[in-house]
Structures are given as structure tokens and as C-alpha cells.
Amino acid sequence: MTINIQNTKSGTTISKYIYGHFAEHLGRCIYEGLYVGEDSPIPNKNGMRIDVVEALKNIQIPVLRWPGGCFADEYHWKDGIGPKENRKTMVNTHWGGVTENNHFGTHEFFELIKQLECDAYVNGNVGSGTVQEMSEWVEYITMDGISPMADLRRENGHEDAWEMKFFGVGNENWGCGGNMRPEYYADLYRRYQTYVRQYGDKKIYKVAGGANVADYHWTETLMKNAHWLMDGLSLHYYVHPQGWEEKGSALEFDEAEWQVTCEKAAYMDELLTRHSAIMDQYDPEQRVGIIVDEWGTWFSAEPGTNPGFLYQQNTIRDAMVAAITLNIFHKHAKRVHMANIAQTVNVLQAMILTDGEQMVKTPSYHVFDLYKVHQDAETIDSHGTSSDTITYTISKKEDTIHLSVCNFATQGTEELTFSLETAINEVKEARYIVGDKMNAHNDFDHPEDVVIQDFTAYDVKENKVSLRVPAMSVLTISLTV
């Protein structure tokens, strides 16, 4: 199979925010996963796990969404500020019915953002909160001058305003965020976003709550009634091979279920195409971005764990889903401005799993490591034939071509030749991950069963690079031209 790469032409920039992450007050994502508190014996800096922070910085995390998720539309931010011993508790009704002590609040979130060196995406409460509550939260976070909320922030120990790049006006308001009709939410969005004020010269990117999967009527209604008041419109889509009620095991599955999982991941392409077409009717300049701020695999919770904690193992199959989906996002880079995989630690398709002091990087983490070269790179058009089980991305940054390939077949090797318009000078780097079985994964007893290795099964001749891509693998090769 030969694929011709048009590397002398300019393409669309792949927003680094496509590689965003999501941390909800859910299970052990925040508590134990990211935040252990200042008094924990687990090594931490101001309460944040040092090992987890360093691992996320290694994959160049660009943005983190918080506090939810369904939790966002129950969260009242004033309960999470001030001395920890005085903070109100609440019951996390969506996720396990546990009592939330609110020790991780606004100040702690922005401390985490500072340590991660990434941007903040805060999700406001429309479902059970007031316009005033949301407005005051924005003021508390971003107001540098003299004001009631800025003064309150200073009383709580933080003199300067923080930078909040993204703000979500509600979450899943078609469901857990209020069971609203799109017409009703569109009016609420128009009202609430009015009071997401910009203090100073730092613009806040406003994200409207968008559709669940293929609810094209929701997208149509929001765009028709409020597109000029939003910067982004969200979309949520999860992959669960057996269906919503019985989602299937993360570890025990057969080849047919592997195939269904990959096919469902590929459905993201149709979703983005159809939602984009609706948005194009009202926004032909494609100013409003699609914000896929919840995506990934969602399997049945691991046996013996709280089903409300959504803890699942992560295998090479999850790595296939990650690569397939990221390649689709790149294809739709003109419209997809941000995406946030669910979730960062210990929940759903996590990058990292923790158990006490132990930490494991998942196969999905390694895909984000392999693909980080595409952040803010330009897509490159190509044409040619390839197998139905091959998906790839080609991008360039300065004089380097980055080629990432996923072979989600369960057996056999695919031979691919990529032909450039100019000669190849050298191979800067070639790395990959591969599974020796369909459920290959890392756990606390075997933390490195799936790791990034050097990829050597390639040949370069003049303007061509030939690859022998094994089954169940994801690779990235970087070439200078």
C-alpha cells in the first residue's frame, strides 16, 4: 500500500487543546489520584501528587477540565474555599453517594493548574446554581481590582487573579444537568453567559452545553438561537461495546467485542461530520469550535469496586480507541478546537492508575505520549489506499514530518509506504507500543507490560519511508525533510 503525502502544502493547525484532560469529583480521580493533601505520606507538593503531576507534564497536558461532569451542576463553589476545617460537606449523589469534604476547591484547582503548567477549563453550575453564583465565581477567579469577590479571594490567601481560559456554562443539561429541552437550555445559556464577565484583557472562551452523541436537534437549536454568544459547543460520546446498561468488561472480551469497540470509536467521524454540517449553516466561517469535552471508553466497573467510582482497567484495546479517535479529531481540526478525554486518573479511560503510593501509566497514556508531537502542528493531506484496520495522521512542524499509524487488526503485519514530495534527510525518532494479546495491560504487579519501545521496522529510500506495522500497535515516526 502506498500513500502519497503532500508535504509542501500548508494544512490546518491541530489545536494542542485536542489533547486536553478532564478531572471530576468522581471516585478516586481527584482525591487519591491527583490530590492527597499536604499531610499525606505520599510525596506531594501543596497536596498534589508529585509523580502524577510529573507524568502529566511529560505528555504536555494543555488544559484540564474541572469540577465536572455531572458533579458540576451540583457544585457550589463557595463551599470549597476558605480554611478546610470550615468547609461544608456535601453528598456526591451522582457518583457513589459518598460524602465530599470540599478540601479540593478553587484554590487547590488553580494550584494544580500551576504545577501542571496548563490552562484551566472551569465548568459552571446551571442545573442547580444561580446566575449570581456563576457570575461571582468568575469574578472571584479573574478579577484583579477591588471588588467583593476579589477581596474575598485575597482574604483566602491569593492576592492575584488567576487566568481562566475556558468556561463551560453548564454540563449535560439534556440529562444530569437538569433534563432540559434544547429550547429551554438555549435561553438559559443566553442568560447565564451574559454574566460570565471578562475582567481585564484576558478573554474567556465560553463553551455552551452541547449534544449527547447524535442529538442533532440539540445542535441545531443551540446554533440557531445562540451561536453568536458562544465560542464553543460541547459534544459527549463514550464507547461501550455491549451497550449502555451492560457495557462489557475492560479485561475479559473476545475478538468480536474488540472489533465492535474499534468500530464504535470510528463512529466519532460521522458524529463530527454531521454536527459540523449543522454548525456550518449558522457559522460558515467555523468560528465556533466543537468541544468534545467528554470522550473515551466506558466499560463496566472492575469487580469488587464501587460501581459509582467508574474504575476500569486500561488495555491495548483502549490504546486503539485513543489513536483512532485522535486521528479523527485531526481530520476535523478546522472545527474541533478542544477535546478532553475522560478521565485523567483512576476513572474510565484514565491516563494513570494509582494505589496508595504506587502509580501505573496506562496504554492510553503512552498513546498521548506518542502523539504529543502533533500538538499545534499542521495537518498534511495525503491520498492512497490502506487497510480498513489502519488509521493514521500526518503533520508537520517546521522541517519535521510526524507520521502516526494505528493498526487495530488483532493479527498480521501491514506493510505501508509513505511517499513524500521531497527527500527525507533523516529519521529523528521512531517509537511504538504493541500488545502481545488483546487485553495486554499494566497493573501494579506488572507496571511495564505495555511500554513505549524503539520502532525499527522501517526503511527509508530517497523520498519514501516503508513501515511494517504489527497488529495491535500504535507508532509515531518523525522525519526531517
List each language-model region with its residue ranges.
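Active-site His/acidic residue clusters
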Residues: 238-259, 305
